[in-house]
Amino acid sequence: MADANSIADAWAQVHGEAKPEEGGVGQWIWEAIQGDFNENRTAGQITADMVISLIPIVDTICDIRDLCANIRTYRKDPDNKLTLFFIALTVVGFFPEIGSVIKGVVKIIFVYVRRYLKRAEDLLDATKLGRATNAALDAALPKIAQFLSESRVVKWATKEGVPDIFRFCAKHLDELAAKVDAGKLKAKFDEGVEAAQTLLGRIKYIVPGSTRDKLDDFLTFVGQQKNKIGDAIGQFTQPIRTILKLTAKRLDDHAWIAFTQTHNKGWIAPMSQQGA
């Protein structure tokens, strides 16, 4: 992982902010990790967050930020299975095979799934999970389309010779779904925790004492609960696969709709099942 100053340089570049003075770098990164995660982000903020995540180093710190946020929520209510499920969703971002573009799509849909999935029991009910996922996709598809139209994504797709970005994403999401299993979720959770421990361990020596105490307390909790959480998230393999497969199908459907619209100017294709 890059050092604290490299991360600060990248973050400042993205946000257009001056890099803080040397003594404030650790505090700045700590505040970014604990403060920037917001479940109630606007649609514009979600898309901007995904574009920011395309930048190396910032991508890593965004993953760490989201993982830390979910672990803090788990600490408040360790019996809440939905929180464990959201940790499992976050862990998918640590799968290296998906790349930054696919990860951006995955994160957008997961943000919306959180809004529409309200009961842990629904994870075990295929009908209710499918209904919640499709509602989330109705809301998320315009944002996914916006993200995939961003200049950084377009430049990447052009460079890589990707003819249809929607079909490309659909194919890779299907492949990702097949790779999700309990063992891999635990392994990637462990990697994510280690990345968080490494970053926070580096900055704790350059933050004020009061912040260091909070940081040490969080690191202690993570160390104590790491194995328990890692074992528990394996139960969500099937729900995650379902969400990824439904997303892949909707993106593939949208690719076909867009193709049809191009060849039939008299019909306007809907972005969602509701025609929105």
Which residues does each PLM region occupy?
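Long, low-complexity, intrinsically disordered regions
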Residues: M1-A276
